[in-house]
Amino acid sequence: YYFPNSKLFAANINPFQLKYFSKRIREFYVDVSSKKTMRNLAEYLDEYFDVIIDDASHNLSDILYALPIFFKKLKKGGYYIIEDIDQFKVFKNLNPKNEKLTPIMILKNLEKNQKFDSNYISNDEIEYLKKNIKDYYFEKGEMILNDHNISDIVFLKKNV
């Protein structure tokens, strides 16, 4: 099997999908639409991670809530990966408040050191991300729907 020396942590809103039986996998029932619940999970976890993959609900608010909370749980030099980063552009129900600031726009603002406001990320969290994201890059997906690539992935590297 892959990564035989690794430990895996999985968080899911659907308790019926939490069905892995392995000493290497710890599972948590979590509502990622609740910033408080995600903060509680981050505080509960006494681990820091080499890789964190956000392949959760694809709701824009959930992606933006999770990023600053769980990016802090990365080891130095670790990677935070967000899958299907633009699905909310096609599926409007994934952005019910019609938030204009997308994860890609946030990364570009951070890179250019431009000030911005977010309904989901506090100013303190923005400053933390500015100081701690070393680099990011995109991997183009192949799933196109209504002229939008909905399967792009972004990789964020934490400072060493």
Predicted regions span which residues?
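S-adenosylmethionine/decaboxylated-SAM
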Residues: Y1-V160
